[in-house]
């Protein structure tokens, strides 16, 4: 049985918790607080102590005269029935007689069910209840018929019979109709376990047949005292001490209950054998006509009030003396107990289930049996122990009635348990098991994202990663390798969604599609070819475009090299027909690999410029590979044929090795020898471009759809804001359109062509500069025109969040527990923090990638804190101050206040206009941050010829310098027979004759003092050396 707590016992005894704790200490039992639990033997001992004391507990019930009616209490009194107190019997439903008409005779004689043998009564003093609410004034006692003679208990002061009940006390709960009065006239027996005076019921056998063997006996409750073995509670005497009503079907010695006007008897309810019933006023009861409200109440039910289940008996016959008119039971309800009608069952409800009796507290309509019968309304019905059985506690304590036995598990429960048993466990953490399913995750996803896909707890995944040697948090972006490792442990397959595919899914969620021409074949019109000029640096790409456009762009480029992507549209005559060609100029420096790749992806034809005097160079091969990867046709322009040493034939032979075979050699690649500086053969090159486009490409687009294209370059203009150079690939872009470019969006405020002229619209294959974006987009980002600004904003924000996660996952280094020592020693690793600002996004990207590729050793590292397009601002200086960063301005300068702030705070701001100068200086700074490396340089050796002992200085070695020289305050080691005897010694004293000297050269003699080291012998060798800094490579 469950242990009870101190405050529960205090509530049962009707005293404060500190009184119970004090009594426990008197008994030698120590408890910590009122919430402490105590064992059953201690409960019995405590109950006996309160019974003997009498003052603190509830006194034994005694007859009381009727008192004047008192106001009805609003709540059940806490001093009512409990499981182990000697309060009035919980089963007694006695109440003051109500004013009623003359009693009616019961409709029929109810044959009584056989009763179970009552246990031996045990008498003893029991505590009396606390002050009870005064009952209503009792009316004149009705006339009763004399019952058959029965022997009365010798020590029973009240005439009300009270038989011991087989079960324990039943819990009481306030009934909805109000509490019934508890006062004089309620005690039906003073001592617990005392038999009824009426003896055996009429018509009932002496012993109940078929009692359940092995059932709990009344005296088995460990929370009752030894003197209360019968479990019967004392009851208050009935009003005016009158005899118990009896009649046909009633209890022995009592007549029928007087009936009220409403058809309900006003007399006290009869007591049935089988245990105590809830205390008066503790069980709620729907208020009916003629039944007055009952004052008083009881404590809330607790586990100590659980009744025992007695032996089952036969179901009582229907139609006993109920509370209905004429004593008959209600329709469908069982009869009352013999000796007085109980509360009969409601319509549709089963009868009461007390042993040998009819309706107890009956179930609601449609419910099961009453209190102790079949499962009735929750809170009333007991355990469905069958008719005549004492129910469990499910109904009594607000739980739905149901079988006590363990229900059969459903298939779903069994399957879940089986899957839990089969789930993988890593380090004691249970994980869901996959069946090889493919989980799609974006790059830079966190463990929380992964857990949502597989319905797992993110904290479990963090614990598993710790067991696998990886330290990550639940919301931290993790690398692809980490996700694959974790998924493999749970039998899942992780598919990292590429940025292109993720972007396509994002657009599809807004019913947008990029890269497809809308409409039918009739809507497609011919568009100009897009040609990208590629090649090695200084091979003449920009000069060629100048010659075609008849301009001088190269004069404006710093250092004479192109560091931006330029897009131009040129109208030329080919075969007496004017044709437009769009040219894209890409940088040739090795730092602009990504820029060249973007140019190749957005083009139709690639012109590979190769200098005739240099031949094929590294960036030539790289540009060639980009063009092949983009699957675009290539036209080779052999430039600088007019310079000394030019050999176009050599160039053709070199390119043959890379799969470009000239037409004159039987291939399909067109080679054109030109001189951009002199303007030679430019027309032939343009003709070759047009012929290649017409022969191998279908250049058509739909000009009436919403514009789509690619951002070639972008920058932050001081007067215009964000300016993006875009190439329209399909559709027509107009001023006023809402467009989203990467993570930037906005409404097109103005458009400029390559000559700086305002244009109202741009068709397919037209490069324009767009003004009106919220921020500077990245080079190579796709743009698309949408209908609403809200859609553009949502797409841009989601793209920005995705890029942040991917960048964080890229920057985050995997830290394993094995490498934790190295990480904790991170102070030894020097970091060069950089803030990069440039004039164009492509240049900033190229500079960042080139700097991050610098590798000068593991002791130093580069960390780019921030990169952006535009001038150096005060916020950049603030960031540099907080992180000791160097600000790099690439083709931009610091604004007025930002420059003053940088000078005042000592922030290092460096300006560059050529990319390779920036790379060289940053590399030199990294090498300067390296810790110096030292190497050992041998100075000389000295042979000990004599050992001189000095009380002041110790042993002094008289030596002959064999090689090199010996200097004072240098390091030395002592060798004996070729073995090192001592390391890291210091030459503390050096003398030649009696003079202190700083060095002794080869062939001279002298004296050497090695400080505190005195273990020197003749013929030992002293080798001296010094540590010199080694230059870093």
Swiss-Prot record:
Q: Which GO terms describe its biological process?
A: translational initiation
Recorded hits in SUPFAM superfamilies, A to Z, give: Initiation factor IF2/eIF5b, domain 3 (SSF52156), P-loop containing nucleoside triphosphate hydrolases (SSF52540), Translation proteins (SSF50447)
Region (Disordered) spans which residues?
A: 49-432
Question: Positions of the region G4?
Answer: 639-642
The yes or no answer to whether the keyword Cytoplasm is present is: yes
Main localization of the protein? cytoplasm
Q: Where is the composition biased (Pro residues)?
A: 114-140, 148-164, 236-246
Pfam families per the UniProt record, alphabetical: EF-G_D2, GTP_EFTU, IF-2, IF2_N
Q: Which UniProt keywords apply?
A: Cytoplasm, GTP-binding, Initiation factor, Nucleotide-binding, Protein biosynthesis
Q: Where in the cell is it found?
A: Cytoplasm
Family affiliation = Belongs to the TRAFAC class translation factor GTPase superfamily. Classic translation factor GTPase family. IF-2 subfamily.
Q: What is this protein called?
A: Translation initiation factor IF-2
Q: Which organism is it from?
A: Streptomyces coelicolor (strain ATCC BAA-471 / A3(2) / M145)
Q: Which gene encodes it?
A: infB
